[in-house]
Design a protein with these regions (language model features):
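Multi-pass alpha-helical membrane architecture of UbiA-family
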Residues: 1-309
Length: 309
């Protein structure tokens, strides 16, 4: 039992849990405040923060891991080359018991979400459908990242519905489309750099396998131009400027790690970059969470120290 739990937790890739949890937090910030896109300002409303927010954050954190079990099974052909030491590939983690645990976990999230608001089921179903579509479209460059981005962004919509008891409104949907979706697109795009060898062998087409220079251009220019635009619109607000410098530095370091085939450290940095991008507009209120998340991701990567896993 302990052996199964150990390999199940490793297969959950807990560091990615902070990506979905942070997406939930971004959704909660939208529900708890009013975001002015012209002034790039976020103002808290009277909606109180409660244990329900904490419950939604926990759901977001574990949702990635529960789903990752199914993804590992579907991707075992590519993983046999890219990550041959993963428990699902080596046989250390038995599929059926792992599927059962994940199914129960996802069902618990669905029930808890429904009790908060029936709207949550719609976004849970949409995210699940898009995740299946992503698995089927992995061989289609750009579209694969776009579908993935919309799938994970459903976490923010799930959070808004769960805490506010309503469907997300127009400005909230616009923010998700303008910022949260691109942040996840970038993370998915960056994740393919480490998989070039296995993807080529398995016939998976990504920008990294067919147009590597374009892939690098997207990885560097998109986040840098995004934060530059926000700084220009905010007349170089000090907080945003400092955070922008950090983001640009992480982008540069990420590319250096990739160029030296240091993919394990690059994956860690990719996670941290995504967390910062998601919280970019709300950093004044979420800076403590951001620091804890970045440190936790770094520490978790010490446990996941096998680059082939």
């Amino acid at each position: 039992m302990l052996k199964f739990l150990y390999y199940y937790l490793r297969s959950m890739r807990l560091y990615y849990g902070f990506v979905t949890a942070t997406t939930v937090l971004a959704g909660l910030c939208l529900a708890h405040g009013t975001y002015n896109e012209l002034k790039l300002s976020w103002t808290l409303t009277d909606l109180p923060w409660t244990l329900r927010d904490a419950a939604l954050l926990a759901m977001g954190f574990f949702a990635w891991g529960f789903n990752q079990i199914f993804s590992d099974w579907c991707d075992r052909k590519e993983d046999a080359i890219n990550a041959p030491h993963r428990p699902m590939v080596t046989g250390a983690l038995k599929p059926l018991p792992a599927f059962a645990v994940s199914a129960v976990g996802l069902a618990a999230i669905a029930v808890a979400g429904y009790l908060m608001s029936p709207w949550t089921l719609a976004f849970l179903a949409l995210g699940g459908a898009l995740n299946i579509a992503y698995s089927l479209l992995k061989r289609v460059p750009v579209l694969n990242c776009l579908v993935y981005a919309y799938a994970i962004s459903c976490c923010a919509l799930f959070a808004i519905a769960g805490i506010a008891g309503r469907c997300p409104n127009g400005p909230e949907l616009e923010f998700v489309g303008d910022w949260i979706v691109p942040a996840h697109f970038l993370m998915c795009h960056n994740s393919y750099f480490k998989d070039v060898e296995g993807d080529r062998a398995a016939g998976v087409r990504t920008l990294q396998t067919i147009w590597p220079r374009v892939a690098k251009f997207v990885s560097v220019c998109c986040p840098c131009l995004a934060v530059l635009r926000l700084n220009f619109l905010s007349w170089f607000n000090v907080e945003l400027f400092v955070l922008s410098v950090i983001v640009v530095a992480l982008v540069i370091v990420f590319q250096r790690l990739v160029s030296h085939s240091m993919f394990h450290r690059a994956t860690c940095l990719n996670c941290q970059l995504c967390v910062l991008m998601l919280l970019f507009h709300f950093i004044a209120a979420t800076w403590l969470y951001a620091i804890v998340s970045l440190v936790a991701i770094q520490l978790l990567f010490l446990w996941y120290n096998d680059e082939k896993e």
